[in-house]
């Protein structure tokens, strides 16, 4: 699922805090915005098995 909320791509350089918007450009500095959604799940993740095993051990 893709998020409609976008963030200013250069907010660290131009703003004190993140600027969120629905537009394709930042309303404050007119720079390009990017999607705020996390990276998609990758089933070929080489370390996924180890991460899941560690998470399960922590739960027990």
Swiss-Prot record:
It comes from Haloquadratum walsbyi (strain DSM 16790 / HBSQ001). It comes from the Archaea. This is Ribosome biogenesis protein Nop10. The gene is nop10. Belongs to the NOP10 family. The lineage of its organism: Archaea, Methanobacteriati, Methanobacteriota, Stenosarchaea group, Halobacteria. GO terms for molecular function: snoRNA binding. Pfam families: Nop10p (PF04135). One of its GO terms (cellular component) is ribonucleoprotein complex. GO terms for biological process: pseudouridine synthesis; rRNA processing. Keywords: Ribonucleoprotein, Ribosome biogenesis, rRNA processing. Involved in ribosome biogenesis; more specifically in 18S rRNA pseudouridylation and in cleavage of pre-rRNA.
């Amino acid at each position: 699922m893709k998020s409609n909320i976008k963030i200013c791509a250069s907010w660290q350089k131009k703003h004190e805090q993140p600027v969120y918007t629905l537009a394709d450009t930042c309303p404050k500095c007119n720079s390009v915005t990017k999607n705020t959604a996390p990276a998609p799940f990758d089933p070929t993740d080489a370390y996924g098995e180890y991460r899941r095993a560690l998470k399960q051990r922590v739960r027990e």
